[in-house]
Amino acid sequence: MLVKQKIIPKKDGIKIINGLKKIEKEIDKGKFKFKEKFEDIHLNIEKRLFEIIGQSAGHLHTARSRNDQVVTDFKFWIKNATLDINDVLNLLIKSILKKAEKNIDTVMPGFTHLKNAQPISFAHYLLAYVEMLIRDKKRFLNNLELIDECPLGSAALAGTSYNIDRKFTAKKLGFKKPTGNSIDSVCDRDFAIDFLSAAATCAMHMSRLAEDFIIFNSEAFSFINFSDKVLTGSSIMPQKKNPDPAELIRGKTAINYGKSVSYTHLRAHETREDRGWRGGGVK
């Protein structure tokens, strides 16, 4: 974009692109040496670029701030994570549907207050979770619409005096359009809060399913069996087969709740960009 807008010479733009590609390969191969004295990833890459292409690397920072770059990177991460989660949810839904199809005529009790209430099929029970997971997918994918705006060009918070083309940059990076307000652009982390909220709701559904399976697997119910591959035994009671995976899924739900709430609180300050949002152990 900087070359297109004649902000920097074409030869320097080519050098920067080639240099960044070389750095990318070094990072992918684990050969890039990060140095703490250079403060962060941005300065590490910039210093390495100077080593590779010389003074042309000075143009790298033109019309750009860490503020707009960080939120852009964050949006990329959320996008990729959302698509990965969507793929996993699709596989889980297909697996549940396959199991439901085989159990259309399998009768089981439906419960209220953990007491037998009405007869249902096991398929009907499983399909309840399909509905939950479909809603989870929608929550994650709806957030992609909110993410699909590119913050680059907002700079520190008030834009830049360079004659940049934000629409061109947004399109090149796969965004639908540039963001509308530079202050909001660098302060916005709503998309992360929405992502964590969707993750917490999805985790809650997984916890419910895990708890159901723990109960159904118990001797009192004996509705389902787990493969020995995922069960653990006891050091003193040889008859024990413990559903550890389901228990771990249930237990980790609290982590998702905590991250969602703590990150929301971190963002509840006046309209500005600072490093506070990176605290609190939220990763």
Where are these regions (language model features)?
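Acidic, glycine-rich loop-and-beta core segments that form the ion-binding/anion-interacting portion
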Residues: 179-260
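Charged catalytic carboxylate motif
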Residues: 88, 125, 132, 198-201, ...
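A helix-coil-helix interface module used to build multimeric assemblies
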Residues: 1-159, 164-171, 177, 232-234, ...
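Conserved small/polar residues in nucleotide/adenosyl-binding loops
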Residues: 264-271
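Hydrophobic alpha-helical segments, chiefly the membrane-spanning helices
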Residues: 275-283
